[in-house]
Amino acid sequence: MKRKIGLITAMVLGTIFLQAQQNTTHTGSTGFGLRAGVNFQNINGKDENGNKLENDMLTGFNIGINVEIPVAPDFYFQPGLLYTMKGAKSTDVILGQTFNSTIKISYVELPLNLLYKPLLGKGHLLLGFGPYVAMGVSGNVTITGSNTSQSRDIKFQNTVKITDPNNVVYMKPMDAGANMIAGYEFRNKVSFQLNTQLGMLNINPEYASMPNDKTSAKNTGFGFSLGYRF
């Protein structure tokens, strides 16, 4: 899995670099950027009985690179590559005891945005939207109570067989959805950005032992980030 992710990452970076080099030759306006920020993520959906999930937001982070490729006046294609943390928190009362759960899932994410970047004052307005795809790389679930505390790693697979180990938490490896961005880039190339994200894939796997499982889990959230463009 890690070798496959590394190969995909290398191919994406190579494609972005070659495309950027071609556009730099012709227009001189393609730019690379670095970006890092904070996420406020949640997992929405339904439990195995079809009841709405009641989760709380988890604070995470994201860091990565992107490139702006001009496609028309004030419009850019902006692919990126991010390492980002998603997940959620929840509190449950079972037999009179309170348990706090935290799910943390790390992804390598590829956003593909169309960016509108007109002049505004001494800088540029940033408005964009587009799809994203992401691959899970690691994660864990921690559960704490008054007399107990345990942590389990997340294993990524689409289907869970009856014979699979039960000492891990299973999640589907792929996530995908839509995102929107709004922000401002100052004259010194520093930018501030707000982003929102809506996951469209169910990241809960299928369990062979639970044919009537109604669980649906989708990533959603928003965040703030700072960037610098070269």
Question: What kind of region is each of these model predictions?
Answer:
Residues F75-F77, G123-L125, N188-L194:
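Repeated loop/turn-to-beta-strand initiation elements of outer-membrane beta-barrel proteins
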Residues K52-T98, K189:
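Glycine- and aromatic-enriched membrane insertion/assembly motifs of diderm outer-membrane
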Residues G28-T30, M57-F61, K104-L110, M174-A178, ...:
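Residues that define the transmembrane beta-barrel architecture of outer-membrane proteins
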